[in-house]
């Protein structure tokens, strides 16, 4: 089970976008994430009329390493760490380390 999953709200703790918040769009291999509105790059897109893609300079999100983000805790309104807890019924859930509340998935 991963500590950061798709649709989690994260806050950037290192890099040029430090302090910005965004939602995880995709989790890639090698502990990399694509977060909406974070780590924006300009890609020079070649036109492809067969696919209906116009050419030009397109702005899109690039991957960011998971160590540079932390999950956002809405209760404390701060970055937080994530741990795991096994409930009585045997389910494993993610919990915030600061207050022990379950992470909303």
From Swiss-Prot:
NCBIfam families: rplX_bact. The keyword Ribonucleoprotein applies. HAMAP family: Ribosomal_uL24_B (MF_01326_B). Part of the 50S ribosomal subunit. It holds the Pfam family ribosomal_L24. This is Large ribosomal subunit protein uL24. The lineage of its organism: Bacteria, Pseudomonadati, Pseudomonadota, Gammaproteobacteria, Cellvibrionales. The keyword GTP-binding does not apply. Keywords: Ribonucleoprotein, Ribosomal protein, RNA-binding, rRNA-binding. Belongs to the universal ribosomal protein uL24 family. It comes from the Bacteria. GO terms for biological process: translation. One of two assembly initiator proteins, it binds directly to the 5'-end of the 23S rRNA, where it nucleates assembly of the 50S subunit. One of the proteins that surrounds the polypeptide exit tunnel on the outside of the subunit. One of its GO terms (cellular component) is ribonucleoprotein complex. One of its GO terms (molecular function) is rRNA binding.
């Amino acid at each position: 089970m991963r500590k950061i999953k798709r649709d989690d709200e994260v806050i950037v703790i290192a890099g040029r976008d430090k302090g910005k918040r965004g939602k995880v769009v995709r989790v890639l291999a090698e502990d990399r994430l694509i977060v909406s509105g974070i780590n924006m790059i300009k890609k020079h897109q070649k036109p492809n009329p067969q696919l209906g893609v116009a050419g030009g300079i397109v702005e899109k999100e690039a991957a960011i390493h998971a160590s540079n983000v932390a999950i956002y805790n809405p209760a404390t309104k701060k970055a937080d760490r994530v741990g795991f807890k096994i409930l009585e019924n045997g389910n494993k859930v993610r919990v915030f380390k600061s207050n022990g509340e379950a992470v909303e998935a």
